[in-house]
Design a protein with these regions (language model features):
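Acidic, metal-coordinating helix/loop segments flanking the phosphotransfer/catalytic sites
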Residues: 65-107
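Conserved small/polar residues in nucleotide/adenosyl-binding loops
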Residues: 2-6, 236, 815-824
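Conserved mixed alpha/beta core segments that line enzyme active sites in large multi-domain catalysts
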Residues: 283-321, 370-770
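A short, hydrophobic beta-strand element within the central beta-sheet of small alpha/beta folds
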Residues: 1-4, 41, 106-110, 127-153, ...
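Short amphipathic alpha-helix used as the core "switch/output" element in two-component signaling
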Residues: 1, 16, 92-99, 114-138
Length: 826
């Protein structure tokens, strides 16, 4: 009765699942290819006994297979892809179900005696099996009967036989289904002897084994749909469907079959890894793994951005439709924020970290601390797969926020790839500790204060990422790297602000971050490059130096300067490496012309002409699409970092890697205030080249570097003085205008004063003055100016030779003098 049903939980579960399968089967089967196990039985008592065992087995197998999935979401999808169980009680019902899903039958379990044409037929099950065998020679069938004489007929029909009277029928049924319906491990056998040649436990095992399976065994299993059935039972529908559709009729096709299976697995694994943040499992992480996490905490800002990019590539296949170019993110593993918490608490570091100790001392304490032991084996497994230098990047909770910028505040280290894995482990551990320590450096604390955040609430995840590039002797660097923004504050000619802007340079992207002379172009107007519009500009305003990773630097001690093992080299060094082809043009001094392309002799000028104007590499098209997709999906302007390797003798295919995406934070709304006409006599500053927008109130101070007797050799000393002045204004809660010669924030003291953002964080308008006889371009393309625009800080470039520019230095000096006189009289 109903009371007995409620007492038997397994029966109640079977009833619920049977109803669910009846309701969901058609949609799941037709949409994704879910398989069916057909049970043909008319005895209520028997199917009430068998169904609970059947469901228990299928659910347990699905749970086991789900552990092969990359994360919890994928596990849930795998479990939902379990085979559906359909119950038929008559011959006609069984035939109807089979005919409805002939290509989705995983197997059949049938009684022998049940109704056919309205009458009890003692051979109905055998007739149904004969009907099936006419259509499918190899579909697994289990015949169960209380009459042992039916066993001969079962053998004739190539079906398994089970005795209903056996006390161990449930056990026998489970074992038979496990062996014949594709569940459990896959065993490749010798078809002549039955000897097991190889056992495959998962898809990775199959990929690693398939090339060594003998032709006879492979043909035996492949021609009988054994492999596709095994994949179907694990809910790997795309690859199973591909193999099922390919019919092999001769052993001579074994090599073709072998390659088809291998290629299908590779494509399937790449597809499943794309756009998914997998749980790192060292025994499964291999060259087809793309993005994994260690720990249960947050991925941090950059980590979330990378996951966003990876999923965006998956959602927009057009990004991968360029022949000869592969688009992806670098192989990435993220140490989640809970690893940071464990490291800080286990080593009792908060007291040191929150103190006022110098940065060098804080770093020293962190380097002496110990990372969790559980990470060692994971790191070793990671080393076995990457085979390239590793970038150790910060990914804090606050980085790449939609409302506050935290770009370029924390350290990023790069370590070379070494054959000595113990030494590489030491380098990686120190790099991770160095990034953790950078959270508590003085600049970081000052930045947190400026953004009204609390330092001890910051959490740090770490991104371990392959460094994009190629090795050239003892140095390593990509063909080029860059930053693209979907919003361009400096449109020229026919360009519009929403067309975006890209800065690209040979070598590591740090060159752009440090304010080097990168090439600037709009991805919608790649031929419209201001820097190469005249011969003089091309020779004076294009890249002359680049950054590379020093592969001999492993013995160096880690420093608060995260570029301690980077080399700043001349473009001529890259020419010696033979790495510039495709990115440079050649200056002909005799004809006074720059010729697109690489030619022997003559100065090499970094113009990217072959890429931007002659289509050697679809950089502009890909950036245009990526910026558009990113802006649409984030709902605001975005900035994207990238790096690329052009095709060479080692790699025939070009590679474009997206390294990071972040929102361009701009909390100011556009204002319609009319300024009206203002006479130059009433102006202190005026420019025809400005970054930012809006009105800035309550500014009473000007901090400026005098142009008379200015020496760039003093720029480092000037930076320290400005830091002190900024600290004073921070304590007073006041803002100021900052004016000085050259590029603010450049690490090259010949170009400008090497301040960092925390040193000038209270300035509301920053002005860069051109030096005499020195043409200076606006400094776009760095983390520094991302912060300027994000905080609503104005930026002027003033060129004395331009009629649209003005700086009344005499008035500022006079006001400065009067202020001193007033203070003296007081």
């Amino acid at each position: 009765g109903l009371g007995d049903v409620y007492k038997r939980q397994d029966l109640l579960l079977a009833i619920i699942k049977l109803i669910e399968d009846k309701m969901n089967a058609e949609e799941d089967i037709n949409s994704v290819g879910v398989q069916v196990i057909l049970l043909v039985e008319d005895s209520i008592r028997f199917y009430s006994s068998i169904l609970p065992h059947l469901y228990k087995f299928v659910l347990k197998q699905s749970q086991i297979f789900s552990t092969e999935a990359l994360n919890q979401h994928e596990q849930m999808l795998r479990m939902r892809g379990r085979p559906k169980i359909k119950l038929a009680r008559t011959y006609e019902e069984a035939v109807a179900i089979y005919n409805k899903y002939p290509n989705n039958m995983l197997g059949i379990v049938t009684d022998v005696s049940f109704k056919r044409a309205g009458e009890k037929d003692k051979k109905a099950g055998l007739k149904f099996c004969s009907y099936i065998r006419e259509k499918d020679e190899f579909l697994p069938i289990i015949i169960e009967s209380s009459e042992v004489e039916n066993q001969k007929d079962a053998m004739f029909l190539n079906a398994c036989f089970l005795d209903k009277n056996s006390k161990k029928l449930p056990v026998d049924l489970r074992k038979t289904i496990l062996r014949n319906f594709g569940f459990g491990d896959f065993e490749f056998i010798n078809p002549h002897t039955g000897e097991v040649i190889a056992t495959v436990r998962n898809l990775k095992d199959l990929q690693n084994t398939i090339m060594s399976i003998p032709d006879e065994s492979l043909y035996y299993h492949g021609s009988r749909n054994h492999i596709s059935r095994w994949l179907y039972s694990r809910a790997m529908f795309p690859i199973a469907e591909l193999l099922r559709q390919k019919q092999f009729t001769d052993i001579s096709e074994s090599q073709e079959m072998r390659q088809l299976i291998f290629d299908a697995i590779v494509q399937y694994r790449k597809m499943k890894n794309r756009g998914v943040v997998a749980i790192f499992q060292r025994e499964r992480f291999d060259k087809y793994s793309n993005f994994a996490r260690i720990g249960q905490g947050s991925l941090g800002g950059k980590g979330r951005g990378l996951a966003f990019i990876d999923s965006m590539i998956k959602r927009h296949p057009i990004l991968e439709n360029y022949e000869g170019v592969s688009v992806s993110i670098p192989k990435t593993v993220v140490l989640c924020t809970d690893i940071f918490d464990e490291f800080m608490e286990t080593n009792n570091l908060y007291q040191i970290a929150l103190s006022d100790l110098p940065d060098e001392d804080i770093l020293e304490y962190f380097l002496k601390a110990k990372l969790p032991d559980k990470l060692v084996d994971d790191f070793m497994a990671f080393f076995e797969v990457v085979g390239r230098p590793i970038a150790v990047r910060s990914s804090s909770l606050l980085e790449d926020s939609h409302y506050q910028p935290f770009a370029g505040i924390y350290s990023t280290y790069m370590i070379p790839f070494l054959e000595d894995k113990d030494e590489m482990l030491r380098l990686l551990s120190d790099a991770i500790k160095g990034v953790y320590a950078s959270v508590f450096y003085a600049d970081s604390k000052a930045y947190m204060t400026a953004t009204s955040n609390v330092i001890d609430q910051e959490k740090m995840a770490i991104i371990l990422q392959e460094v994009v590039g190629s090795q050239y002797g003892d140095r390593y660097y990509p063909s080029f790297a860059g930053v693209g923004r979907s919003l361009n504050y400096y449109p020229i000619n026919d360009e519009k602000a929403e067309d975006g802007v890209v800065d690209v340079a040979v070598g590591l992207g740090k060159y752009i971050v440090d304010g080097g002379r990168s090439l600037r172009f709009s991805p919608k107007h790649p031929c419209n490059v201001l820097q190469t519009s005249t011969l003089d500009l091309a020779l004076s305003d294009t890249q002359t130096r680049f950054y590379a990773l020093d592969l001999k630097s492993m013995g160096k001690t880690f420093s608060i300067d995260d570029s301690f093992n980077l080399l700043k080299l001349s473009i001529r060094d890259a020419e010696k490496d033979n790495s510039l082809r495709g990115m440079v043009s050649t200056f002909d001094p005799y004809d006074q012309i720059i010729r697109d392309g690489y030619y022997e002799g003559g100065r090499k000028v970094v113009t990217f002409a072959n890429i931007l104007q002659h289509g050697v590499f679809p950089l502009a098209e890909l950036l245009k699409m990526m910026l558009e997709f990113g802006s649409q999906e984030m709902g605001r302007p975005v900035e994207i970092e990238f790096a690329a390797n052009l095709p060479n003798q080692e790699h025939k295919q070009g590679m474009l890697y997206w390294l990071q995406i972040r929102p361009i934070v701009d909390t100011k709304e556009m204002r319609d205030d009319e300024i009206g006409e203002v006479r130059d006599e009433d102006l202190l500053l005026k420019t025809d080249s400005a970054l930012g927008h809006g009105i800035m109130d309550n500014i009473c101070h000007v901090v400026y570097v005098k142009s008379d007797n200015f020496r760039s050799s003093n720029n480092s000393l000037i930076a320290r003085e400005i830091e002190k002045i900024n600290r004073m204004f921070t304590e007073r809660g006041e803002n100021y205008i900052l004016v000085g010669p050259g590029r603010w924030g450049s690490s090259d003291t010949a170009l400008g004063i090497p301040v960092k953002w925390p040193h000038i964080s209270n300035s509301k308008l920053i002005v860069e003055m051109a030096l005499a006889g020195y043409h200076i371009e606006p400094s776009q393309g760095t983390h520094f100016f991302q912060n300027l625009t994000s905080f609503g800080v104005g930026y002027f470039t003033i060129n004395p030779s331009s009629k649209g520019c003005l700086f009344d230095e005499e008035s500022v000096s006079y006001t400065h003098l009067r202020a001193h006189e007033t203070a003296a009289n007081l």
